[in-house]
């Protein structure tokens, strides 16, 4: 030591010793910091088995859908511990059968039924407690909608599907309608536009008590909660759609009607019409070739595979004598209302008009055609679609909330505000829109 002191000097040696002591202290503090952080924050992929177990448990509890997806992937790769579970997963993932070719027999929805009116009448004689009409003019109605069995490709799409079904449930509750939500593809051949046809036929046959099915697309919402359909107008008709006679029968325009919201009576005529409508629907060569026929025949139709709406126009225009007398193309109110011409006018409607009109002044339905909130790609910017869908939902929701004394702060806000003070005599509060106990609500009739 004294040799070192003589070489570097006594003062310099003391500085070196002080630095060494400080370095030791720094290393000790660093080790203590690592130990503390490892025990509290977590060691990540270099952690202890106990900490790793905690992190795994948190991960799978917080993200159960991810755990299920990983489990499903493992089974599909043959990694499942149970051979029966593996076989079940493989069966579920089996590819669809080859598409129908042009040489195959035409597609059918099921066995031909020719006496449905007689079968249904006999059923009603056996079950008088469920008549097809709830009063002299109002039929028993089942509103039908649905979505894909798979999650939306756009994560926010599932949230807007929830808003859409909530909106429909509100309207059905106020108007005494039943509702059916479908998430099953009943026939793989009829995917896409055409998936509704097998479902409608199945519901007609399973529910003879229902007089009308009301199909509504998942991207359509009720905007007028007070509007009751003019049922007395539809006595002689079996199919009611939004459209114009001159555009369908004279111009043969492919947008002369809309199949996103329509009514179909439960009768033999409807089964026959579905049988005529369906053969253009099977995916593959049949749908592609049918699309060429529709594009050639219908005015302004772009080139793409056959869709249910174009096929409807084609059938009515080419076979008007057979079907036209039982089809009512409604344009007195918005059974379907194109969102692009409605959503920017909501504030004007609120200022100048009131619910219960159903037409351009206060539309019954706002239909977001082309938005595809559940998919990754639509015909319009996704930000605009989602913003306007939020406004449309709140526009209808305000009519429900007002019954309970609330409203959204604005059409673009999820937050609500109180619009009247609470009272000790709540039954004396006036129901301004008449939606709490509407006279048009379907009441269950009793047989005498």
UniProtKB/Swiss-Prot annotation:
Ranges for region Disordered: 71-113
Deletion consequences: Root hair phenotype, characterized by short root hairs with bubble-like extrusions at the tip.
Tissue-specific expression: Expressed in root tips, leaves, inflorescences and panicles.
UniProt topological domain (Cytoplasmic) ranges: 1-19
Keywords: Glycoprotein, Glycosyltransferase, Golgi apparatus, Membrane, Signal-anchor, Transferase, Transmembrane, Transmembrane helix
Tree of life domain: Eukaryota
Expression triggers: Down-regulated by treatment with atrazine.
UniProt-annotated location(s): Golgi apparatus membrane
EC number: 2.4.2.39
Topological category with respect to the lipid bilayer: Single-pass type II membrane protein
Residues bearing carbohydrate: 421
Listed GO biological process terms: root hair elongation; xyloglucan biosynthetic process
Lumenal side: 43-448
GO molecular function annotations of the record: hexosyltransferase activity; UDP-xylosyltransferase activity; xyloglucan 6-xylosyltransferase activity
GO cellular component term, pick one: Golgi membrane
Residues that span the membrane, as ranges: 20-42
Catalytic activity reported: Transfers an alpha-D-xylosyl residue from UDP-D-xylose to a glucose residue in xyloglucan, forming an alpha-(1->6)-D-xylosyl-D-glucose linkage
Family per record: Belongs to the glycosyltransferase 34 family.
Function: Probable xyloglucan xylosyltransferase involved in the biosynthesis of xyloglucan in roots.
Protein name listed in UniProt: Probable xyloglucan 6-xylosyltransferase 1
Organism: Oryza sativa subsp. japonica
Lineage of the species this protein comes from: Eukaryota, Viridiplantae, Streptophyta, Embryophyta, Tracheophyta
């Amino acid at each position: 030591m004294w040799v070192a002191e003589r070489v570097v000097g006594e003062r310099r040696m003391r500085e070196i010793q002080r630095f060494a002591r400080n370095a030791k202290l720094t290393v000790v503090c660093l080790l203590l910091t690592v130990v503390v952080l490892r025990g509290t924050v977590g060691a990540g992929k270099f952690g202890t088995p106990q900490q790793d177990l905690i992190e795994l448990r948190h991960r799978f509890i917080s993200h159960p859908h991810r755990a299920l997806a990983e489990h499903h992937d493992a089974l599909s790769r043959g990694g499942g511990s149970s051979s029966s579970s593996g076989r079940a997963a493989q069966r579920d993932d089996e590819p669809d059968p080859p598409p129908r070719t042009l040489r195959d027999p035409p597609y059918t929805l099921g066995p031909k039924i020719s006496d449905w009116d007689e079968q249904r009448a006999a059923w009603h004689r056996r079950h008088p407690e469920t008549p097809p009409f709830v009063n002299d003019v109002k039929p028993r109605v089942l509103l039908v909608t649905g979505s894909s069995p798979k999650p939306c490709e756009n994560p926010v799409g599932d949230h807007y599907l929830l808003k859409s079904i909530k909106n429909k449930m509100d309207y059905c509750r106020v108007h005494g309608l039943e509702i059916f939500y479908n998430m099953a593809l009943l026939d793989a051949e009829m995917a896409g536009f055409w998936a509704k046809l097998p479902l409608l036929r199945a519901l007609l046959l399973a529910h003879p008590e229902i007089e009308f099915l009301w199909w509504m697309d998942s991207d359509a919402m009720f905007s007028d909660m007070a509007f009751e359909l003019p049922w007395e107008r539809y006595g002689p008709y079996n199919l009611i759609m939004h459209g114009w006679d001159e555009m369908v029968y004279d111009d043969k325009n492919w947008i002369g009607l809309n199949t996103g919201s329509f009514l179909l009576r439960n009768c033999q005529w409807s089964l026959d019409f579905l049988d005529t409508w369906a053969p253009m629907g099977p995916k593959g060569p049949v749908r592609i070739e049918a699309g060429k026929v529709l594009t050639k025949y219908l005015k302004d139709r772009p080139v793409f595979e056959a869709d249910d709406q174009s096929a409807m126009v084609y059938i009515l225009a080419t076979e008007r004598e057979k079907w036209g007398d039982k089809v009512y193309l409604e344009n007195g109110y918005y059974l379907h209302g194109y969102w692009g011409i409605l959503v920017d006018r909501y504030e004007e409607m609120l200022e100048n008009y009131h619910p219960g009109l159903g037409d351009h002044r206060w539309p019954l339905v706002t239909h977001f055609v082309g938005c595809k909130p559940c998919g990754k790609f639509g015909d319009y910017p996704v930000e605009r679609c989602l913003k306007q869908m939020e406004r449309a939902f709140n526009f209808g929701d305000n009519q429900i909330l007002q019954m309970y004394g609330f409203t959204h702060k604005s059409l673009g806000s999820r937050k609500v505000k109180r619009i009247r003070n609470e009272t000790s005599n709540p039954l004396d509060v006036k129901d301004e829109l008449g939606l709490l106990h509407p006279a048009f609500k379907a009441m269950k009739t009793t047989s005498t």
